Amino acid sequence: MAIGLEHYLTVAAILFTLGIFGIFLNRKNVIVILMSIELMLLAVNINLVAFSTHLGDLAGQVFALFVLTVAAAEAAIGLAILVVFFRNRGSIAVEDINMMKG
């Protein structure tokens, strides 16, 4: 039995749904929200690679590499901001971040 396109799409849909549930069910911790967003980006990348392979076009795979690069940079910058915020405020709760004043 070969693994077809529908298997990849099913896995990607499950990962995307888990990411959405992670955002909606845990609104108190910023790190969990960032991890859920990364899980959703991973699901999108799986879709890009699956469709790219199915259609025989490399554009989707190249675009997935760019998305992974940007997602890694976004995660690094987001975590660095959270570390600085935790050092200054002592908490990374979403309520505390919403109270920031410019």
Curated annotation (Swiss-Prot):
It comes from the Bacteria. GO terms for cellular component: NADH dehydrogenase complex; plasma membrane. It is a multi-pass membrane protein. It comes from Parvibaculum lavamentivorans (strain DS-1 / DSM 13023 / NCIMB 13966). One of its GO terms (molecular function) is quinone binding. Disulfide bonds: none annotated. Belongs to the complex I subunit 4L family. This is NADH-quinone oxidoreductase subunit K. It is an enzyme of class 7 (translocase). NDH-1 shuttles electrons from NADH, via FMN and iron-sulfur (Fe-S) centers, to quinones in the respiratory chain. The immediate electron acceptor for the enzyme in this species is believed to be ubiquinone. Couples the redox reaction to proton translocation (for every two electrons transferred, four hydrogen ions are translocated across the cytoplasmic membrane), and thus conserves the redox energy in a proton gradient. It holds the Pfam family Oxidored_q2.
